[in-house]
Regions:
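All-alpha prenyltransferase/terpene-synthase fold signal
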Residues: 1-210
Length: 210
């Protein structure tokens, strides 16, 4: 179980380091991100080093079953990130695509954590059940986190409106665009496309969504 926990935590940390590079984020949980301190080149190498530790630890412990599910999670998260980046260019993400993105980007990691727990104690008969449980938890977590981005900075404890700045089409924005007047829809899309760096425009978009 300790080996499984180490593997998934190394994976989690590596993905956070790489995510901060992709998102050009300078903070992570109230502290400077790796790329903010040592630039993108070092951050990418740090993330890669952690992934290499997963491979070595798995081989040293002969945990090929754990390595298989961790490798699958890396593939899923990478595909999810690429899908989100590709769709962000055209702002044409549907609810169906949104759920596919968060299933791959977020839920696959939590699903792998749960599945790895079952594998580590030899309960392979519960492996699929634990995976599906973790996937459901991951999807719920990401939806809640996306809703928080349209809340109040003071209540949430972190900056809001980040998804608009990064042109991320999350569920609150997708739902609003599909259910408002043509005028408000055009205004929202214009803000996301052209005014996503302007604080007052972002505040206006948040108001339209909530």
């Amino acid at each position: 179980s300790y080996d499984a926990a180490a593997l998934v935590e190394l994976l989690h940390t590596a993905t956070l380091v790489h995510d901060d590079v992709v998102d050009d984020a300078n903070e992570r949980r109230g502290f400077f991100s790796v790329n903010a301190l040592w630039k993108n080149k070092i951050a990418v190498l740090v993330g890669d080093y952690m992934l290499s530790r997963i491979l070595l630890l798995s081989l040293e412990k002969e945990n090929t079953d754990l390595l298989k599910v961790v490798a699958r999670a890396v593939r899923e998260m990478s595909e999810g990130e690429l899908l989100q980046l590709e769709k962000a260019r055209h702002l044409d993400i549907t609810e169906e695509i949104y759920f596919e993105v968060i299933r791959k980007k977020t839920a696959s990691l939590i699903a792998t954590c749960c599945e790895a727990g079952a594998i580590s104690v030899g309960n392979t008969q519960y492996q699929e059940c634990m995976f599906l449980f973790g996937e459901a938890v991951g999807i719920a977590f990401q939806i809640k986190d996306d809703i928080f981005d349209y809340g109040s900075d003071n209540k949430i404890g972190k900056p809001t409106g980040i998804d608009i700045r990064e042109q991320k089409m999350t569920l609150p924005l997708i739902y609003t665009i599909n259910n408002v007047s043509q005028k408000d829809r055009s205004e929202l899309l214009n803000i996301v496309r052209n005014k996503n760096e302007d604080a007052s425009s972002i505040a206006r978009a948040v108001d339209l969504v909530i």
